[in-house]
Each structure stands twice: as structure tokens, then as C-alpha cells.
């Protein structure tokens, strides 16, 4: 039986993690698990059910009733493909509040680890290399300037026909950087053994080539 491979990709919002992880996953035949989308799914359901980030017990009951899995890189929640719903600006603004709750993270991290025990996986998020997959075979930390990340997110949403304001996105990214880096539970930080790649000014395929070269050594 072939040994399972685990790849961790971490970095701030808009650093290109999911796009790059998806391509690497296809190239090396790894299951791509977008962990951020799992927290976004929790945020979506919480907002739909009017459950605030302070109502932890209600949140945990809600999560226990959520059936999440991935099909062709897309998140399926209770039988419904919710990828288009969880990228809406309202979810982006609220996700940090729910993702910073210790009990919520414990529930989802447990689910992520179970996936990694069954399949060769590539996961992207904020704490994959430091918490979720501490013993990952490969760890990468992607960065980019806030302006570059805001520009990417702006173009991505406009292409989807969602009217957005660049400055609002930039301020949202700066705020999320602060919240993600300073939260008490599993803050955004680079694992000591992770390879850092600044994606500012580098095309997606340039980053893919860099990561591939490390994995093919």
C-alpha cells in the first residue's frame, strides 16, 4: 500500500492558497481540502440560523448536524454544493469571529485529521502546518502584500458578477490579518519547518513551479 502524503499550505486571506493548492492537488493526485471553506460553511449556517459567535453550545449542536465532504474540490454541505454561497462578502466579514472559537476549531480540526488518515491530502488554511497537520510531509507558507491580495479578491468577485469596492476589500483584509494573527486560539503563523513563498508579483503557475520543485526533490 502506498504511503499517504500530506501537504500543508498556510497564509493570510487572499494569498492564493486555494487556487495553488487545487492545482498542486491535481498535479500530484492529492485530495484538496479547503479548510477555510469549512469555517465559512459554519459561518453560513450560523448566520442563516441567527446563532451568534457567543452562543457556543448552539453552534456545536449545529455543527454536529452538518454533513460536510468534498467532491471535485467543492464543499458539499448536507447534500448541497455551497461554494458560491460561502464566497459572498458577508461571509468573509464574519468568518473570523466563528473561526476563532476554540470548540468550533476543535470540532473541525478533528474532521480534517480524519480525512488525512484516509487519503493523501493537500490542505490550506491558517494553522495547517502548526496545528492540524504538524507532521505534514511538506509545509508551505504563502504571503503577499495586502494590496495585492485585495486586488486578487476584487477581480475574483467582479468576475463572478458581485459588485464590490476595492477599498472595502483592502480594509477587510487588513482587519482579518490582524484578527487571524492575534487571536488566542491557533493564530496565523508560519511553522518553523515551513518554506515561505512571497507570491507578490509572481503568477500562479510560478508559485506552483516553486512548490513542485520542492516536492519533486
Swiss-Prot record:
One of its GO terms (molecular function) is CMP kinase activity. Transmembrane segments: none annotated. The keyword Cytoplasm applies. It catalyses: CMP + ATP = CDP + ADP; dCMP + ATP = dCDP + ADP. It is an enzyme of class 2 (transferase). Pfam families: Cytidylate_kin (PF02224). Its EC number is 2.7.4.25. One of its GO terms (cellular component) is cytosol. HAMAP family: Cytidyl_kinase_type1. This is Cytidylate kinase. It comes from Clostridium perfringens (strain SM101 / Type A).
Amino acid at each position: 500500500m502506498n504511503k499517504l502524503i500530506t501537504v500543508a499550505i498556510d497564509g493570510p486571506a487572499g494569498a492564493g492558497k486555494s487556487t495553488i493548492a487545487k492545482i498542486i492537488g491535481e498535479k500530484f493526485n492529492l485530495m484538496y481540502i479547503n479548510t477555510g471553506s469549512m469555517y465559512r460553511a459554519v459561518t453560513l449556517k450560523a448566520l442563516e440560523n441567527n446563532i451568534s459567535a457567543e452562543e457556543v453550545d448552539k453552534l456545536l449542536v449545529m455543527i454536529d448536524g452538518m454533513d460536510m465532504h468534498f467532491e471535485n474540490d467543492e464543499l458539499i454541505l448536507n447534500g448541497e454544493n455551497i461554494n458560491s454561497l460561502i464566497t459572498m462578502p458577508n461571509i468573509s466579514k464574519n468568518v473570523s469571529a466563528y473561526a476563532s472559537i476554540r470548540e468550533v476549531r476543535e470540532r473541525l480540526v478533528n474532521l480534517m485529521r480524519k480525512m488525512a488518515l484516509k487519503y493523501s491530502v493537500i490542505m490550506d488554511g491558517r494553522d495547517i502546518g502548526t496545528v492540524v497537520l504538524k507532521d505534514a510531509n511538506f509545509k508551505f507558507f504563502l504571503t503577499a502584500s495586502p494590496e495585492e491580495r485585495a486586488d486578487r479578491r476584487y477581480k475574483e468577485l467582479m468576475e463572478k458578477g458581485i459588485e464590490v469596492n476595492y477599498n472595502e476589500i483592502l480594509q477587510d483584509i487588513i482587519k482579518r490579518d490582524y484578527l487571524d494573527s492575534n487571536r488566542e486560539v491557533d493564530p496565523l503563523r508560519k511553522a518553523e519547518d515551513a518554506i515561505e513563498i512571497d507570491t507578490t508579483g509572481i503568477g500562479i503557475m510560478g508559485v506552483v513551479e516553486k512548490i513542485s520543485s520542492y516536492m519533486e526533490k
